[in-house]
Amino acid sequence: MIEIVDYGAGNLRSVLKGLETVGAEVRLCREPERLADATGVVFPGQGSFATASRRLVELGFADPLRAYLAEDRPFLGICLGLQLLFQTSEEAPGAEGLGALAGTNKRFAPGKKIPHMGWNSIRLKTRNGLFEGIEEGSFFYFVHSYFPVPEDKSLIAGWSDYEEEFCCAVQKGNLTAVQFHPEKSQRRGLGLLANFAKRCGSDATAA
């Protein structure tokens, strides 16, 4: 069973519906102990880095998530769920992310319309794994004001541009995390969700 981490920070129903659409066995997870037996974990998120990181601790998800990530099992982070994998964010000095990846999150340079919201194309380093079948230059839906800056640039799996180039996807083993919203990105987003479901053992098919 794929578990979607429900910590009160995201459009979870859309993610759930997207995975159900491609045939995944999936449910919302409000009990952190269920992560230990998951076939895969989806970690969405929207909103404040500080609030979300505090909620993960208060609800008991922080340490089980770290333990799950340390085992290199199928994991998909979405939007704030990508940013929280890193250690820190300029949005909330002093707040701690999960620290699964070394690096921080930076705000777009002054002068841009914030948040970066709408459809934008991505460039991929690889079209293997969760990006299999996704064409170079495909458009995905973004809503964010910050973006990740990994210390290890080899983890970057994709880039996009908003007057400056930024990392929009990372991969490390069975961990994939994206800044865009696959659940809002129509056919290509469903393709990515189907690829994740297959990695988790589901007999999934992109719609």
Report the location of each language-model feature.
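N-terminal beta1-alpha1 ligand-phosphate binding loop
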Residues: 2-24, 182-184
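Structural signature of beta-strand start/N-cap positions in the alpha/beta core
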Residues: 25, 40, 74-76, 139
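Short acidic low-complexity segments
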Residues: 26-37
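Structural motif
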Residues: 42-44
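Cysteine-nucleophile active-site neighborhood
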Residues: 47-119
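Pocket-forming structural segment of enzyme catalytic cores
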Residues: 87-163
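Short, surface-exposed beta-strand/loop micro-motifs that present aromatic residues
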Residues: 164-171
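Acyltransferase
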Residues: 178-207
